Amino acid sequence: MHTVIIIGGGAAGMFAAYSAAINGNRVYLLEKNEKLGKKLYITGKGRCNLTNNVGVQEFLNNVVCNPKFLYGALNELSPDDVMGFFENNGCKLKTERGNRVFPESDKASDVTKTLQRVLSEKGVKIMLNTAVTEIKTESCRVKGVETESGFLPCDSVIVCTGGASYPLTGSTGDGYIFAKKTGHTVTEIKPSLVGIELNGDGFSDLQGLSLKNVSVSFSAADGKEIYRDFGEMLFTHYGVSGPIILSASCTLNRTDLKNVKLKIDLKPALTEKILDERLLREFERAKLKSLSNAMRSLLPQALIETVLIKSGVNGEKRCCDITKSDRLKIAYVLKNLEFSVKKLRPIDEAVVTAGGVSVKDINPKTMESKLIKGLFFAGEVLDVDALTGGFNIQIAFSTGYVAGKNA
C-alpha cells in the first residue's frame, strides 16, 4: 500500500485526498490551519460558487491561462462529475445566473462538511495545524516531508498549497518555495480577479454605486482595445470592482497599465443617435426644469453630476435652453464615461493568483512533476487561472482528483 501525503486542505487538497484514498492508498492530508477548506468558506460571498454548469469546451473558453493543459483533467472530472459527487453525498445544489452552481442552502460550510465527511469515511488521516517546512527528495524521487513536528516518509507528495491571494486563509505562497527548491520554474505571480484602482478623484462621489447592464472597455494609449465585457460593476473608494471588473483584471494583469483608459457605456442598448433622440424627448417634457433635475429619469442621482462635469454642460441650465451641441456632448459621455486606470489592487485582495508552477514542468495527464518522481502539483499553485464564476474551484477539484488518482 502506497503512502500519499497531501500538503494543503483546500479544494484541490481535499479532492486529491479523496481520489488517492479510493485508489487504495494510505492518505495523510496535512493542513497548517485549524480547519480544512478555509478559503472555500469565503468564496461566492460565503455561499461557495463551487463550479460552473457548462460543458468542457465552454469551460475552457473561460480559462485565461494555459487552457489546453487542463483538457485532460476536466475530462477526468467534469463540472457534471463534481455536481454528481456533491448531490450523491447529500449536498443539494442549485444553478443560478451564468450557470454558477451553489449549495441549495447558500452555505459554503455545507460544501466543506460534505468533503470532510467523505474523507473521514474513506479513511483519510487529517492532520490540522501541521505546517510542512520541506519536501525531501533523493535521486530525483520523493522521500517524504519535513514538518515542524518531524519527518514523515511517503511514496508520493501532492502540493495543493494554493496561491498567494487571501493570505489570511493560509495561502502564503509556500508551494512556490517547494517548487523552486525542487528545481521547478515558477512564473511571475500576479493578482487575478481583483479590483482596479483609478487615477484622480473623479469617481470619489460614486463610491458604493452599483451599475447593472453596462458595457466596459479598456484601451491602451494607442487606442487599441484590450478588453471588453458587459454586466455588473461597482464603484469603490479606490476605483472599480464587481464581476466584469474582476474578469477584466485577468487580462489587465498581463498588460502595461500606463495610460490605459476605462470607458463605461451606461446605455449599451442605445446608439448615440437614438440616445440623442431620447434626451430630446426627455428635455422637451421637462422644459422648465433644470438639466440636473431632468437627468434623474436617465441616471442614478450619484452619476448625474459626474456625467455633466465630464460633458462640460451646466446642470443649472433649464432644459428649454439645452442646445443640440449640449445634448450630443451628454450622449457621448453616457456612451463613453472615461476614467484613467492606475493599477490593480494588491494580491492579498485577489480572488485567485495568476502565475505559478510552470505547466511545462508538469504532466497534464497525471499532474506529476516531470523532474521529481512521486511529486505532484494541483490547484491554484499551478500556472492556470480562469474568470469568475466557479471555474477556478472546479480547476482545483479536477487537478486535485487527477493528482490523487495517479499518486
Walk through the language-model features, giving the residues of each.
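A glycine-rich dinucleotide-binding beta-alpha-beta segment and adjacent secondary-structure elements
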Residues: M127-L128, E134, E305-D385
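Glycine-rich loop(s) and the adjacent beta-strand/alpha-helix scaffold that form part
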Residues: S156-G202
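Glycine-rich active-site loop/strand segments that organize a redox cofactor
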Residues: R47-T95
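Short hydrophobic core segments
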Residues: I5-I7, L30, V132, V145, ...
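Feature captures the FAD/FMN-dependent oxidoreductase FAD-binding
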Residues: E76-S156, I304
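Glycine-rich FAD pyrophosphate-binding loop
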Residues: A21-K45
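N-terminal Rossmann-like FAD-binding beta1-loop-alpha1 element of flavoenzymes
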Residues: H2-L29, A403-A407
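An anion/pyrophosphate-binding glycine-rich loop and adjacent beta-alpha core
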Residues: E34-L36, Y41-I42, L50, V56-Q57, ...
